[in-house]
Amino acid sequence: ANQGGGATILPGRPMTAFAVLRLARSLMKRQDGGFIPDRLIFQDSAAIAWWVPPGMRRIWFRCPEDQLVAGERSEVVSHPGLVFCVTTARKWFVWAIKGAARPKDSTRLFRAPYFNVWESGQICVGNVDLPERATAEKLDEWTSAFFDSWFTHPNVHSNLVRYRGGAYRFWRDMLDGKHVVFPERTLVDLDRTLGEALQSRGAKHDN
């Protein structure tokens, strides 16, 4: 209160993207409708982003035989925590994070260690059959579309992972079962936070 006994409005501060989402969650819980998935971490009129915790998933490779021993290989391997983002322009991004905690706007991002992903994190979709819409109800379909596709070649030709022998050697060892738990030390720091990436939608969109 001020000296006259009236209320005083203090200086405010801009809301972060995550603060907006928390407010939206609070308001939507008071209304009838569908549930908000726990893995949804951001949504506005231009994009939606969600988190996939670290865990075991099958991955598929179709590469030259001299790179992964066989032309086609598929194994269940460990994966790091991931954040996916799809924009209304259907630009699709993926970034890696360390640990198993739900990401916040201050969470540091790392390069997703996968083939067919550009430096910005944008996924090269090729002929992947994508869901028609990017909505909260479709998150599992988008995640499955990523992991059920063939990984064919690195779009980042150096520094995809920090691993002796490079990306092909890394994934050959992963497929051979040499790392039961995903080796987070191999992830390349992108020197940016999740909040920064979501504000810029990946900084640039690769064609």
Predicted features along the sequence, with ranges:
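Compact alpha/beta protein-protein interaction domains typified by the UBC
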Residues: 1-133
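Domain-scale recognition of soluble eukaryotic interaction modules
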Residues: 106-207
